[in-house]
UniProtKB/Swiss-Prot annotation:
Classification via CDD domains: GT1_Gtf-like
Database matches in Pfam families: UDPGT (PF00201)
Keywords: Glycosyltransferase, Plant defense, Transferase
Active site, renumbered: 21 (proton acceptor), 132 (charge relay)
Free-text disruption phenotype from the record: Decreased resistance to avirulent strains of P.syringae.
Name used for this protein in its record: UDP-glycosyltransferase 73B3
Record-stated family: Belongs to the UDP-glycosyltransferase family.
Function according to Swiss-Prot or TrEMBL: Possesses quercetin 3-O-glucosyltransferase activity in vitro. Also active in vitro on benzoates and benzoate derivatives. Involved in stress or defense responses.
Signal peptide: none
EC numbers: 2.4.1.-, 2.4.1.91
Keyword Glycosyltransferase: yes
Annotated an anthocyanidin binding sites: 21, 395
Species lineage: Eukaryota, Viridiplantae, Streptophyta, Embryophyta, Tracheophyta
Amino acid sequence: MSSDPHRKLHVVFFPFMAYGHMIPTLDMAKLFSSRGAKSTILTTPLNSKIFQKPIERFKNLNPSFEIDIQIFDFPCVDLGLPEGCENVDFFTSNNNDDRQYLTLKFFKSTRFFKDQLEKLLETTRPDCLIADMFFPWATEAAEKFNVPRLVFHGTGYFSLCSEYCIRVHNPQNIVASRYEPFVIPDLPGNIVITQEQIADRDEESEMGKFMIEVKESDVKSSGVIVNSFYELEPDYADFYKSVVLKRAWHIGPLSVYNRGFEEKAERGKKASINEVECLKWLDSKKPDSVIYISFGSVACFKNEQLFEIAAGLETSGANFIWVVRKNIGIEKEEWLPEGFEERVKGKGMIIRGWAPQVLILDHQATCGFVTHCGWNSLLEGVAAGLPMVTWPVAAEQFYNEKLVTQVLRTGVSVGAKKNVRTTGDFISREKVVKAVREVLVGEEADERRERAKKLAEMAKAAVEGGSSFNDLNSFIEEFTS
């Protein structure tokens, strides 16, 4: 690396092909570019469309900033995948029988990128590579050319620390049943969880072996970039840096860097609703009167569960915006009670598909967030200062729920008991009503709201000269020198 203090840091970003990974990576690349670095995002032909328009707008507004896209080939059919399968959205937008097979096949097929990555690193010699956790082979590729590889997990310190402590101590093996609560050993805060809420850890399965590769790659890497801010999870940031992996930089919340209407509206897919009309609808509501319900880009609930949510929302009497993911192959909408939309007209809005989430969360009419506890959604809710109803489904989402309900105390659990990949643990309408009312009404609700608003202030301060701003400075200085 050059010691020239005036040269630009060149960072290559390589996100996993899922919206929950690509959206924060785009935010991160824009952030680095705005701080004087040159950013290069690696992706596939179909996924490049997600990045192109936001990057063009960003460059038009900031002509001196350097950010571009490099497209890698991903021959789906040759790799044993269906034509056009370049994003997890391809096989998670339905509940078909081969979903599990396709998931594993997709993860393993990404190794095809290794040769292309090595050629790029050899010819461009960037200062560092920030590659997704699901690309464990990226560490070895970067080592060949003495390029530091940083890992981006797309989650926070709390879940990383929780998973580490459970992996090291295996406390789930000494309880009487999968539903018996236990305290996660060594983790600050006496956090209680059950075996049913932990993602399947069968290390002999093909996916289990793949995840072992991921963990080994983490340890060999040059460190971790975390989309979080110190004030959100200080005990866990300290624990991670002292016990789990010594080198980590927190630079979030990344969503906060999107300040303009277009920036917020263009994150991810094209919204399934006109953003201006959506905001007009919210403008017609009183401040703090609308609850927003969304389960992210992967969770895919069955009709029976959607029916219960609809019935619960109607009974709660709350104004709402409810985002329902479109399922491929399901033409008839059998998930709505008869006459539901007519009865809630004016009080409720259903968005079928993709929503301009940050725009909705940031609106003054929005007063709460029913969320699957995916890390991006959780952080966006935190940045908007909203109390939450937590409804985790899979992956590390139950850990994230514990952060909200047990540590931050800004949320109420809907009562999900099982980590069930993508379809969700069945929750009755009565539980939906109870959780929504609990997060909106009463003295405890007011206290949760106050705590949530303080966290939003801390999030803003962190990126505007605070902890995240300073950690990014430290990172840039270290990898430029």
